[in-house]
């Protein structure tokens, strides 16, 4: 536990007026401040109703005082909470009183940072506090709560323990060569390595789902000119975000619209129609469209259901096939069902391709698309599954997987125990970055500075 020399104070509730406002204090002076502000000795971990006093003994406000001696507190330090009325003037007066008594204004996220430094939370749990506050849907809030309760961290720790066991075995064999262990022939090493790689892939998949719920999914609408891409964007956005005409090539640049489906964030990107063109401006738009396709979480490939080429849309554009994400991230949209003989509906092929027939103009079938996008974002997860994750977590998991892949290759092709041991060490270090076991101070500063003041 790291003993703080400074006492910090901040308003812990949201800005503005409210029924209740909370001022939070943490540090070695919290106990003295409890007596000075309340005018009496407070019993630990009990709520005391009474006045909050200024330096002259005048009443600032009335409310509840709660004192939590460390280490049994949120930060691991002595903590004082003053719960009064939620007026900004009253709360500012309480903060000023604490500043007079020797505290300083807390930095954003400093309470959570102290909890992390005092081993009350690991880094993934601390980040989950901010994720829970910022959650834009019930599912995102549930995932953040599970991360705060340690679900993500437990999964990472389990992977780390498996890596440590494998490292001990491999490095012991290296240190005692007289045992003459053949790493390639030793099925124990290969079996453990395969097991940890499989479990890491599972965690990566669930973390990716959690990150989509937290950050939102980027959906790119792509297709031929005049397929109804801009009409689909407008239908999803619920407003005229894009210009719609019968003239092919109206959209020449990338248009971005941020929407919510049942509180779940969605970043929808409308792109220029994919076609060969001599128009310089339109050509730039097509290049940007292909770039957006390559960066998308999901691509909605829109085809005009009344056009002859709609029968086999995936064979139309080699450029799209080169730039698209993995096939499982492409949804085929057969638009203009109101002008064709096709029925509104959703079909899933044996190989997992989803096709939705709809009409962007009338809105028929649009609810099917919304439900499909929600499912792609993990909306159907139960309360007992899923956890919140961030982009930095995904990168750490990716690098850990890359190290294990390299180690596996070294083992299979070279039987190289020394190189495998180094790859295992690197994988463990990348996993440690998630929970804060191997996290640089500058990264910690950036993470906690993004928190609310008072958290």
Swiss-Prot record:
Binding site for K(+): 226, 245, 247, 250
Residues noted as binding (6S)-5-formyl-5,6,7,8-tetrahydrofolate in the record, renumbered to the chain: 24, 81, 120, 455
GO molecular-function term, one example from the UniProt record: metal ion binding
Species of the source: Pseudomonas aeruginosa (strain ATCC 15692 / DSM 22644 / CIP 104116 / JCM 14847 / LMG 12228 / 1C / PRS 101 / PAO1)
UniProt key word tRNA processing: yes
Positions with a binding annotation for Mg(2+): 230, 251
Major location (coarse): cytoplasm
Keyword RNA-binding listed: no
Subcellular location: Cytoplasm
Annotated GTP binding sites: 226-231, 245-251, 270-273, 335-338, 359-361
Record-listed E.C. numbers: 3.6.-.-
Textual note on the cofactor: Binds 1 potassium ion per subunit.
Protein name as it appears in the record: tRNA modification GTPase MnmE
GO biological process annotation, one example: tRNA wobble uridine modification
């Amino acid at each position: 536990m790291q003993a703080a020399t400074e006492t910090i104070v901040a308003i812990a509730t949201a800005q503005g007026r409210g029924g209740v406002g909370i001022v939070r204090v943490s540090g070695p002076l919290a106990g003295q401040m409890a007596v000075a502000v309340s005018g009496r000795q407070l019993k630990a971990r009990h709520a005391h109703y009474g006045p909050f006093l200024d330096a002259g003994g005048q009443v600032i406000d009335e409310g509840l005082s709660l004192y939590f001696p460390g280490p049994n507190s949120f930060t691991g330090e002595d903590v004082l909470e003053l719960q009064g009325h939620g007026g900004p003037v009253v709360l500012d007066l309480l903060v000023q009183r604490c500043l007079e008594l020797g505290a300083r204004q807390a930095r954003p996220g400093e309470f959570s940072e102290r909890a992390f430094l005092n081993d009350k939370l690991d880094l993934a749990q601390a980040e989950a506090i901010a994720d829970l506050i910022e959650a834009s849907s019930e599912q995102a809030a549930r995932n953040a709560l599970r991360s705060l309760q340690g679900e993500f961290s437990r999964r990472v720790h389990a992977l780390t323990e498996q890596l440590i066991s494998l490292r001990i075995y491999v490095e012991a064999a290296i240190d005692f060569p007289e045992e003459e262990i053949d790493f390639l022939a030793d099925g124990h090493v290969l079996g453990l390595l395969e097991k940890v790689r499989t479990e890491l892939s599972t965690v990566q998949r669930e973390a990716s789902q959690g990150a989509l719920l937290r950050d939102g999914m980027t959906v790119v609408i792509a297709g031929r000119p005049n397929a109804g891409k801009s009409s689909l964007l407008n239908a999803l956005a619920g407003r005229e975000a894009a210009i719609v005409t019968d003239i092919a090539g109206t959209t020449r640049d990338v248009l971005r619209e941020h929407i919510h489906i049942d509180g779940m964030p969605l970043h929808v990107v409308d792109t220029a129609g994919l076609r060969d063109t001599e128009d310089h401006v339109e050509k730039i738009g097509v290049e940007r469209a292909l770039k957006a396709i390559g960066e998308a979480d999901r691509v909605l490939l829109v085809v005009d259901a009344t056009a002859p080429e709609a029968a086999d849309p995936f064979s139309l554009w080699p450029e799209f096939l080169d730039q698209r994400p993995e096939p499982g991230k492409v949804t085929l949209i057969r638009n203009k069902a109101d002008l064709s003989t096709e029925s509104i509906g959703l079909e899933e092929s044996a190989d997992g391709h989803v096709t939705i027939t709809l009409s962007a103009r009338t809105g028929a079938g649009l609810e099917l698309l919304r439900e499909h996008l929600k499912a792609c974002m993990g909306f159907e997860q139960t309360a007992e599954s899923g956890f919140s994750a961030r982009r930095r977590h995904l990168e750490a998991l990716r690098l850990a997987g890359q190290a294990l892949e390299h180690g596996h290759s070294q083992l299979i092709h070279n039987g190289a125990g020394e190189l495998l041991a180094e790859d295992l060490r690197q994988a463990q270090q990348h996993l440690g970055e998630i929970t804060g076991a191997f996290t640089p101070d500058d990264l910690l500063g950036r993470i906690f500075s993004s928190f609310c003041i008072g958290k």
